[in-house]
Amino acid sequence: MMDMGHKNKIDIKVRLHNYIILYAKRCSMTVSSGNETLTIDEGQIAFIERNIQINVSIKKSDSINPFEIISLDRNLLLSIIRIMEPIYSFQHSYSEEKRGLNKKIFLLSEEEVSIDLFKSIKEMPFGKRKIYSLACLLSAVSDEEALYTSISIASSLSFSDQIRKIVEKNIEKRWRLSDISNNLNLSEIAVRKRLESEKLTFQQILLDIRMHHAAKLLLNSQSYINDVSRLIGISSPSYFIRKFNEYYGITPKKFYLYHKKF
């Protein structure tokens, strides 16, 4: 839901598929999940675990580049873990014993060295230098054990990740569960049951992929809503607008207008 009381403020629902490092360059953010709330102050760097669903309230102090993001895919996370493993010897478990937001989102105070390192990493191509620089930045987090556990959990490959990889190869296609079962050589019942164990459905995954791709198209291109709808495999623009609003809590037009100066 968008807060129209302040033109520089927006409330949005977010579900992340990649681990991200966020620099709140010219904005502050309030992140909430259930009864928990966490504030990312202007100038802070935040490490945010993937596969968490959060509500984010963003208040811009400037219309130009309010925040910057580095996205870490699974290969990068695994490389970072290989560096961290010999250094840390934590007795952690993956039991998901109700970890709170402060065990999934980690903050660094505004420090010139950390910000300079973030900016440097953002421009680096994939390689050893980038991996070691990321490990260096992550090592600045005070709760090292919780961070290591968070990264380890985020780097695991789930069954739903396999399905995402298949769908993302052709987002325009009108996917059915039978297409996935054929790709994976599994019965539809087996696919459903494995997704149920992750508390997901095929339709949820499909919606996640489409809405994430729609947001990227709105931000990174001059595509009209009708074009975006078609490019993500939804034939009806009005249906796309409704689903986007339900997913993000804001219409595609308002989403674009708020972010167009980013």
Curated annotation (Swiss-Prot):
Induction remark: Transcriptionally regulated by FIS at 37 degrees Celsius. Subject to H-NS-mediated transcriptional repression below 32 degrees Celsius and at low pH.
Domain of life: Bacteria
SUPFAM superfamilies xrefs: Homeodomain-like
A Pfam family annotated for this UniProt entry: HTH_18
Annotated HTH araC/xylS-type domain residues: 161-258
Alphabetized UniProt keyword annotations: Activator, DNA-binding, Plasmid, Transcription, Transcription regulation, Virulence
UniProt-listed PROSITE patterns: HTH_ARAC_FAMILY_1 (PS00041), HTH_ARAC_FAMILY_2 (PS01124)
Molecular function GO terms recorded: DNA-binding transcription factor activity; sequence-specific DNA binding
DNA-binding region(s), residue ranges: 178-199, 225-248
Job of this protein: Primary regulator of plasmid-encoded virulence genes. Activates the transcription of icsA (virG) and of virB, which is an activator of the ipaABCD virulence regulon.
PANTHER family attached to this UniProt entry: ARAC-FAMILY TRANSCRIPTIONAL REGULATOR, HTH-TYPE TRANSCRIPTIONAL REGULATOR APPY-RELATED
Protein name: Virulence regulon transcriptional activator VirF
Organism: Shigella flexneri
